[in-house]
Amino acid sequence: INTLSGVHQPTRGEMYTDGKPVSFSNPKNAQEMGIATVHQFGGTYPLMSIGRNFFAGAEPTKGFGPFKIFDRQKANSIAVEQVQRFGITRITDGDRLVGGLSGGERQSLAIARAVYFGARVLILDEPTAALGVKQAAHVLRIVNEAKRRGLAVIFITHQVMHAMAVGDHFAVLIRGAIAADFRKGDKTREAI
């Protein structure tokens, strides 16, 4: 995850984007190439609003010159619209605190944010960990929706059933080494 998202440099091998070799010296370089990482707990801030979380670090402003202020209405409107596009229709107020959302809704917020800001590759680190069955199913639907929209998704999980629900191509790692590499339908869940 850290190599793909620009935190660490690869010690060997090459990475390619659009058929061209790339290297990232920092996470911002990876983001500029359209690679977004959503970590296990979504990277949200529980005591901040949905609108503030959605735009953390890239807040829309209004005003002129040195007198610009955060445009809360615009941030809330866009955040609610984008989250609803991913099927979370019960979120209607961008001023609502993220701490009041379920784990699945927090993951969905983080995914919607990544898509809005131009992600083409979405790295999801254990997005269903610590979620209940219903919340995990919701996150899996969101992941499939992201795929339907044309995003490449790297879904990291220990849950074989979750991987099978969203994956097309699988790599099984044991202590960082590839133990198996196959496509959907090549192996049964039991064989994995």
Go through the PLM ranges and name each one.
Residues 1-192:
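Glycine-rich phosphate-binding loops of nucleotide-dependent enzymes
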